[in-house]
């Protein structure tokens, strides 16, 4: 199990090779936990003007500062998703094992609904192997 971040990916690769080489255990799929869902929005298109236009579409007023803040948040989220995808791809290239990607749960507490969401994603990932 790993996270789609540089250091955890490095550690997963090193650990996997050590386990296979020293212990002789054949490894199964790698679970990549905390993956942000992909967005249709590239980071470069997250602008204050786009936030203002989107707000007008749903008839909501946002100030210039709010539009700027929304654009910054959207750009950050898109950049984080791109980084995660790149790290998961790097993991796949360095460690030729199937991956089961679990979603990031956007909540402060894990309850029954979140456990079900993660379990469903895990089962779907297994079925896709």
For the regions a language model picked out, list residue spans one by one.
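C-terminal accessory extensions appended to soluble enzyme cores
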Residues: 99-101, 105, 109-129
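Conserved catalytic-core segment of NTP-binding enzymes
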Residues: 1-94
């Amino acid at each position: 199990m790993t996270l789609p971040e540089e250091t955890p990916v490095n550690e997963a690769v090193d650990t996997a090779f050590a386990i296979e080489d020293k212990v002789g255990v054949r490894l199964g799929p790698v679970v990549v936990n905390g993956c942000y869902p992909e967005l249709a929005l590239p980071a470069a298109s997250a602008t204050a003007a786009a936030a203002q236009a989107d707000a007008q579409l749903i008839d909501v007023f946002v100030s210039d500062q709010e539009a700027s803040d929304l654009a910054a948040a959207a750009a950050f989220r898109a950049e984080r998703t791109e980084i995660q995808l790149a790290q998961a791809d790097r993991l796949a290239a360095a460690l030729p094992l199937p991956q089961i990607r679990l979603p990031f749960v956007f909540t402060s507490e894990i309850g029954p609904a979140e456990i079900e969401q993660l379990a469903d994603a895990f089962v779907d990932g297994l079925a896709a192997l």
